[in-house]
């Protein structure tokens, strides 16, 4: 994994945050940026697309700064629907990146969302997001089906690629 920027995208419950945390542990100078944390810095309205764009821009600038200072890889976690991904990459500038897209089946999402104590738990919207990502792959992305997989299995799958 030689890219200074690793983008992990997927629907809620796909395993993005867990993979991001596990990957960060594997690199001595990595940084982990979760868009939910950037959004949470505001009086967040989770349905407000303008707030999401502000958070995307802030995260892109943070990622760019970390990379410029040699803090790599920078692992960025969000849903990253196509328009959001394009906006983030434009704001981040000319940084080599790798995209990892996590997809899963409905049964897996149902189980994972039911286990959540907080956060996004709308199964119907989650499945819709998952299908958008499945139907609109990013160029040169690595797609991982996390259906029925544990956090450790998902981390092992990406380490092997």
Summary of predicted features, one role per range:
Residues 8:
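Hydrophobic anchor at the beta1->P-loop junction of P-loop NTPases
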Residues 16:
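Conserved lysine of the Walker
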Residues 118-157:
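Small-molecule kinase domains that catalyze NTP-dependent phosphoryl transfer to phosphate-bearing small molecules
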Residues 2-5, 71:
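Pre-Walker A (Motif I) flank of P-loop NTPase domains
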Residues 13:
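Walker A (P-loop) phosphate-binding loop of P-loop NTPases
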Residues 54-94:
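Glycine-rich phosphate-binding loop used to anchor ATP phosphates in small-molecule kinases
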Residues 20-64:
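Conserved substrate/cofactor phosphate-moiety recognition/catalytic segment
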Residues 93-113:
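Conserved phosphate-donor/acceptor-positioning beta-strand/loop module used by diverse small-molecule
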């Amino acid at each position: 994994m030689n890219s200074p920027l690793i983008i992990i995208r997927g629907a809620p419950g796909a395993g993005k945050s867990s993979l991001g945390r596990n990957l960060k542990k594997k690199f001595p100078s990595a940084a982990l940026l979760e868009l939910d944390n950037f959004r949470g810095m505001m009086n967040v309205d989770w349905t407000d697309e303008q707030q999401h764009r502000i958070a995307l821009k802030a995260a892109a600038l943070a990622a760019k700064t970390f990379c410029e200072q040699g803090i790599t890889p920078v692992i960025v976690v969000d849903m990253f629907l196509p328009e959001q991904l394009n906006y983030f990459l434009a704001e981040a500038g000319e940084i080599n990146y790798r995209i990892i897209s996590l997809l899963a089946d409905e049964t897996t999402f149902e189980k994972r969302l039911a286990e959540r104590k907080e956060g996004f738990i709308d199964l119907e919207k989650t499945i819709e997001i998952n299908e958008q990502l499945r139907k609109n792959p990013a160029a040169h992305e690595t797609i991982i089906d996390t259906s029925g997989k544990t956090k450790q299995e998902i981390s092992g799958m990406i380490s092997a690629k």
